[in-house]
Amino acid sequence: SLELPGSELVRDAGCVFVALNYRLGLFGWNCLPALTADPDATGNFALLDIARALDWVRDNIRRFGGDADNITLCGFSDGGRMAAALAGSPLFRGRFQKAVAISGGLSLADPDAAAQKLAENFAPLAVEDGRFADTASAAEWLLTPGSDVREWLCGLEPARIAALGKPATLYADDVVLSRDARSAVPLLL
């Protein structure tokens, strides 16, 4: 990334640098009930992407001269927020040994408030599709755990979702992120 100079870290610190990609915005964080109704479900999709990427790093880093028992997760801004949050996530135990959070905080949204905001963000699309006459009714529907909501959400064109341009945020779901988690690895802020 531009904020983390990977080539300089490799040159000056002698480390192996791996940049991870994950879903962004409304594609990465969506806690509408239709997507999270199962007790083991989470709408923290971006974090699940990071979990899989870290599994790949752990399984393959030796091929690049790295040490699978010495992985440091580092992030800047939102990435720093995620690094700090993941340091306390039980799902991430053993996936990395240290974390660095640069210019990030550790605020987690309340899932109910986040779902309400997401429903308001998606409601105009349901109106455009002719499902409802007004956004209030559409938002109310979007807050239900029905399979019809899930099917509609999963059938939306990605460009329409991206065009919403609305921010999404980390939220405590007690699946990936716990409300009261404490860092299980050394964390440099």
Q: What annotation goes with each model-predicted range?
A:
Residues 1-51, 59-63:
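Cap/lid segment of the alpha/beta-hydrolase catalytic domain
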Residues 1-3, 28-32, 84-86, 109-115:
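Short, solvent-exposed loop/turn and secondary-structure capping segments
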Residues 13-18, 67-71, 94-98, 183-186:
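Loop/turn elements at helix/coil->beta-strand transitions in domains of secreted/extracellular proteins
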Residues 45-49, 77-82:
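Active-site loop->helix "elbow" adjoining a glycine-rich segment at hydrolase catalytic centers
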Residues 57, 64-76:
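Alpha/beta-hydrolase fold nucleophile elbow
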Residues 59, 93, 102-189:
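Substrate-access "cap/lid" subdomains that shape
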Residues 75-78, 90, 103:
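Catalytic nucleophile serine of serine hydrolases
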Residues 80-92:
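Short glycine-enriched nucleophile-adjacent loop
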